Amino acid sequence: MTTFMVSKRFRPPIFLHRFINPKPISSQTRFLHPPDNQSRDISDSTTETISTLEFPHKTSVPNHSPLTSTSETENHVDDARVIEVLLGRRNDPVSALQYCNWVKPLHRLCEGGDVFWVLIHILLSSIHTHDRASNLLVMFVSNNPTLIPNVMVNNLVDSSKRFGFELTPRAFNYLLNAYIRNKRMDYAVDCFGLMVDRKVVPFVPYVNNVLSSLVRSNLIDEAKEIYNKMVLIGVAGDNVTTQLLMRASLRERKPEEAVKIFRRVMSRGAEPDGLLFSLAVQAACKTPDLVMALDLLREMRGKLGVPASQETYTSVIVAFVKEGNMEEAVRVMDEMVGFGIPMSVIAATSLVNGYCKGNELGKALDLFNRMEEEGLAPDKVMFSVMVEWFCKNMEMEKAIEFYMRMKSVRIAPSSVLVHTMIQGCLKAESPEAALEIFNDSFESWIAHGFMCNKIFLLFCKQGKVDAATSFLKMMEQKGIEPNVVFYNNMMLAHCRMKNMDLARSIFSEMLEKGLEPNNFTYSILIDGFFKNKDEQNAWDVINQMNASNFEANEVIYNTIINGLCKVGQTSKAKEMLQNLIKEKRYSMSCTSYNSIIDGFVKVGDTDSAVETYREMSENGKSPNVVTFTSLINGFCKSNRMDLALEMTHEMKSMELKLDLPAYGALIDGFCKKNDMKTAYTLFSELPELGLMPNVSVYNSLISGFRNLGKMDAAIDLYKKMVNDGISCDLFTYTTMIDGLLKDGNINLASDLYSELLDLGIVPDEILHMVLVNGLSKKGQFLKASKMLEEMKKKDVTPNVLLYSTVIAGHHREGNLNEAFRLHDEMLEKGIVHDDTVFNLLVSGRVEKPPAASKISSLASPEMRSSY
């Protein structure tokens, strides 16, 4: 590359004189001249390059020129001579350009050197050749990709000083533009910095180009830095600059910042264009400041005389839908359409999605149909939204209809949508439809191995074992070989259905196909047999596993220990745990210890549970919430409340929070000790800890107050329970009715019994005994008779329990006519009696009432059924 040092160009002293006085030293010039008849008509097109400026009608050199060839001219005319001629034509840029084209090839000219920079300065001196200077700089940067901006700027400045040219901002700006045109944004940024250092005012369009490139490249900080430098030298930019800064803020997900930029520009009295208004609206929507967005839409119409674009209106509609304001979203859409702007698919999709979220599928469907009527074709997203919401609302006929419409217009559903459809069909008990959709998606290459696994898992989780089997066969027919994961899921489904023979046969089939069982395979089978109380078959699987030299891991041993505890072999489970720790050096998890502790608690052996807890701590295993909950429950059941409280203190010292089951056990324990004050204090702590009491907790408290005859407190709890949305169960009603009848409140007891029947809860033997023993007393009959007459006078229909009590009372006292009359009256009113209660009341066979403490112990379904 030609050096930029001028000392090597000149031949002092005579050539130095020539630069000072460009006249030749003789009447015959020694420099080559272009032909005088050369055309000087030069286009102003900025896209034209310097190469187009070579002589189109080049003739032989003039007679006064030396007889040398062009190649000789290129090789032997040195830069000093060319510069002398150029300086002589400095006031005629077109002539200077023609001379350079003739004497120096373009590729050599763009290598750099003083000739290039002198020509640039000459071209910049005339408005007619500005574009030529700009294009030359673009080519120069392209030919010198490694020349850093600092060197370029120094050459530009140095050449202007040495050859007496005025240095204008245009020269620097054209150099900046050259870097931009060559996509050298790193050098463009450096060049901009050098310009700012020299207090050169940049051309705003060029800076905008730099900002645009940086924003597109997500170099937001660099873009902001350039803008700040721009402002420091007094250049605020134009609307495009503002747009770029706002886009940068939106890319950073800082819409508030974009809004501030817009407001700052408006405060300076700027006149925003449509695009700037649109960006401001988008920023306001993302803030979201929808009041501002609507104000901007109105202001835009007022200042520009035209409504916003479809894209801008769509932004506002989408924002209102996100805020859940469907009414305003529809109003904006109607306004848009009223201005003759067609509804966009994006806006329509957003509105449809909003209607669906608000469970207004009818309106969503109407909008979808309206969109089609207006000639707007639904896209993949629109169809997917409709199908997804129909599936969520279990309207599978509509879902399938839209799914097929989607395919009919050749829009391929995504794998996610296929999965949603299959899941919906399975929930709707339509496994055949699910299989058909899968088969269709497979033919369309939408389904793949991973998706097959997910769909198969859906079948298994929902207990659709037959459909899962058909699916497995379908996969095999299509060449997809099921792996061990498929077989594990199939076995798990059979185990959950208690089909252990089928689970075992699947295991055998897997072995026949040469698939190796893994830890989950054995765990599933072993756990399944233990849960079905089939200890023998569980051990058969364990022995088969050991015989195959399979190395069991902690998962399997945890399963075995947990299973032994479930079948009442807790001591055996503990022995196995100790052997694993001692012989195999296994570090068993907290789960195994918890299973053993819970096993001992269930059989009432709290001492062994505590011993296991201590061993657990000695072996370096920290107890968790489950551990303490099991122990607290055991102590409460064995009426050792002091130890239960001690466990809670230890739990808190380890920074573990009591969970709802632990609180439930403590509350139940104190209720059974008739310590309702402590029980209710614990109950009051639950909301403060973010725990919602369940039906078991309420039942314990209601039972406790009933045992003490405090039915007012029990009624208050019942009302709170209902207000909190906790559904009462059979035990709740049994306890309440028992207490109310003993308290003589037959009216409320009757209402609760009717409520129980209305909810579809079937009374059991215990409730029947409570009713018979409570209603068969002489006092209750008289009270019920009086209540019946009062209700009739008030034209209020008595309930079945009240009728049954009065009829049975008359029957026992021999008033058969009155008994039959009331029976017929009851049937005429459409009241169907409870045969069991009625027969017991009439027969007079009254069982001994269960003790209150006995009834209160039946909180769990297991204990209730065993009574």
From Swiss-Prot:
Cleavable signal peptide: none
Tissue-wise, where is it found?
Answer: Expressed in lateral organ junctions and shoot apical meristem (SAM).
Under the heading SUPFAM superfamilies, the entry gives: HCP-like, TPR-like
Protein name, per record = Pentatricopeptide repeat-containing protein At2g39230, mitochondrial
Instruction: Name the encoding gene, please.
Output: LOJ
Q: Does the keyword ATP-binding apply?
A: no
Q: Which UniProt keywords apply?
A: Mitochondrion, Repeat, Transit peptide
Q: Name one GO cellular component term.
A: mitochondrion
Family statement drawn from the similarity comment of this UniProt entry: Belongs to the PPR family. P subfamily.
Note the segments forming the PPR repeats: 168-202, 203-237, 238-272, 273-307, 309-343, 344-378, 379-413, 414-444, 448-482, 483-517, 518-552, 553-588, 589-623, 624-658, 659-693, 694-728, 729-763, 764-798, 799-833
Q: Where is this region: Disordered?
A: 27-74
Q: What is the lineage of its organism?
A: Eukaryota, Viridiplantae, Streptophyta, Embryophyta, Tracheophyta
Where in or outside the cell is it found?
Mitochondrion
Q: What does this protein do?
A: Involved in lateral organ development and boundary demarcation.
Query: Where do Polar residues bias regions lie?
Result: 60-72
Q: Which organism is it from?
A: Arabidopsis thaliana (Mouse-ear cress)
* Transit peptide, from-to: 1-49
